[in-house]
Regions:
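Anionic-ligand binding patches
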Residues: 2-5, 11-194
Length: 194
């Protein structure tokens, strides 16, 4: 199995990436498991910039192949917010529940047809030689009116695809349609060309 370091310590993100990559014969380990303990500051203004910052920081420290993901929620009624600030949207130390609560509060007077949104993910793959490649995925949906479901993480309890929130889906169902799943499929296709 080919080993690759994931430039993240986010437990939900790691679980999701590992589940998606495992069938492709890729053994994904966290940056901490690989010996990189530092937090990389996300100072970029785009998902691609933040993913590249993280991937190159881990690569420079460990000199191995790395994938980094930056992703977020873009809500049309909020002019694309929270976007790259999705994790810090309700404050630096806010919980997932607090972020969802803030989002719902901002949209409380927004009619259903105006609650369209999308999750976007950009992956940056840096090979052992330091060369980068980007992959992206988008998942379209709408923001519900209240949290539903126990699975997933982040904004999953309020992000609806069809009749279900992402938090009501099984991991396998979510990974089939998710922004991250789509980006990782592109990465896997890229690996097949090497």
């Amino acid at each position: 199995m080919k080993k690759i370091v994931i430039a993240s310590n986010n437990a939900g993100k790691l679980r999701e990436i590992r589940a998606i990559l495992a069938p492709f014969g890729l053994d994904a380990v966290s940056q901490k498991e690989a010996g990189f303990d530092a937090e990389v500051e996300e100072t970029g203004t785009t998902f691609a910039e933040n993913a590249a910052l993280k991937a190159h920081a881990v690569h420079e420290a460990l000199h191995c192949a790395v994938i980094a993901d930056d992703s977020g929620l873009l809500v049309d009624a909020l002019d694309g917010a929270p976007g790259v600030y999705s994790h810090r949207f309700a404050g630096e130390n806010a919980t997932d529940a607090q972020r969802c609560e803030k989002l719902l509060e901002l949209l409380k007077d927004t009619p259903a047809e105006k609650r369209t949104a999308r999750f976007q993910c950009v992956l940056c793959y840096v090979n052992a030689a330091g060369e980068e490649q980007f992959f992206s995925g988008v998942c379209e949906g709408v923001i519900g009116t209240s949290p539903r479901g126990e699975n997933g993480f982040g904004y999953d309890p309020v992000f609806c695809v069809g009749e279900q929130t992402m938090a009501e889906m099984t991991d396998a169902e979510k990974n089939q349609i998710s922004h991250r799943g789509k980006a990782l499929e592109q990465l896997e296709d890229f690996f097949k060309t090497l």
